[in-house]
């Protein structure tokens, strides 16, 4: 261990980030362990793997409802009560296309539909998906792999409600953990401010 590196800093360590999908089927854990051991030996440091998205990989579902179906030129559109901008920001930031249960199955009569959110953001688009039947008003659509960023990076842009969180137990029973409402949106904007203050400006 280089005393110049650790002087005044205590132990020297290396944080390796959270991008490794160590829970993914087929991930070469043995190779990762060898790489870590080799790095520890060569640089005399402790290495920590951030408990990142691997711990929730492919976990969590996001249930949405179709609000409207329309046609724009050659593009079929379905507007959902779920928003890429508010509820799945990684869709826009990475970009990322979440899996959708029952969609993209092979079939001769599959129709392609662009799914989007109801906010005023023109880019509030989740993605294009293939369906055997055209979704209609009131249909439920369920996205998978939603536990990673939907819970920690969601927002209430345009007053969009946050999704309630439910726990599905091993015996298939359900328990509601959260119940978000307008009060949560209002509270983030300063609900304690006296409205008369704005009238006097």
Walk through the language-model features, giving the residues of each.
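Short, well-ordered coil/turn segments that N-cap beta-strands
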Residues: 11, 43-45
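Alpha-helix-loop-beta-strand connector modules within alpha/beta enzyme cores
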Residues: 33-42
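Charged (often Lys/Glu-rich) extended helix/loop segments that serve as interaction or gating elements
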Residues: 35, 46-201
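Single conserved hydrophobic/aromatic residue that forms the stacking wall/gate
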Residues: 1-13
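Metal-dependent catalytic neighborhoods of phosphoester/phosphodiester hydrolases
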Residues: 25-27
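Glycine-rich beta-strand-to-loop/alpha-helix junction loops that act as flexible
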Residues: 14-23, 51-54
């Amino acid at each position: 261990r280089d005393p110049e590196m650790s002087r005044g800093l205590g132990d020297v360590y290396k944080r390796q980030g959270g991008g490794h999908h160590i829970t993914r089927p087929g991930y070469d854990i043995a190779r990762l362990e060898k790489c870590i051991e080799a790095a520890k030996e060569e640089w005399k440091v402790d290495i920590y793997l951030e408990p990142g998205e691997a711990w929730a990989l492919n976990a969590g579902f996001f249930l949405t409802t179709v609000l409207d179906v329309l046609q724009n030129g050659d593009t079929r559109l379905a507007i959902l009560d779920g928003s890429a901008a508010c509820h799945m920001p990684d869709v826009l930031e990475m970009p990322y296309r979440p899996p959708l249960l029952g969609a993209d199955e092979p079939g001769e009569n599959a129709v392609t539909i662009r799914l989007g959110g109801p906010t005023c953001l023109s880019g509030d688009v989740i993605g294009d998906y293939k369906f055997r039947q055209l979704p209609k008003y009131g249909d439920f659509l369920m996205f998978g792999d939603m536990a990673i960023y939907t819970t920690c990076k969601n927002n209430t842009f345009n007053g969009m409600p946050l999704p309630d969180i439910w726990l599905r137990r091993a015996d298939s029973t359900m328990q509601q953990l959260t119940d978000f409402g307008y009060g949560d949106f209002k509270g983030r904007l300063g609900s304690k401010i006296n409205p008369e203050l704005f009238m006097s400006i």
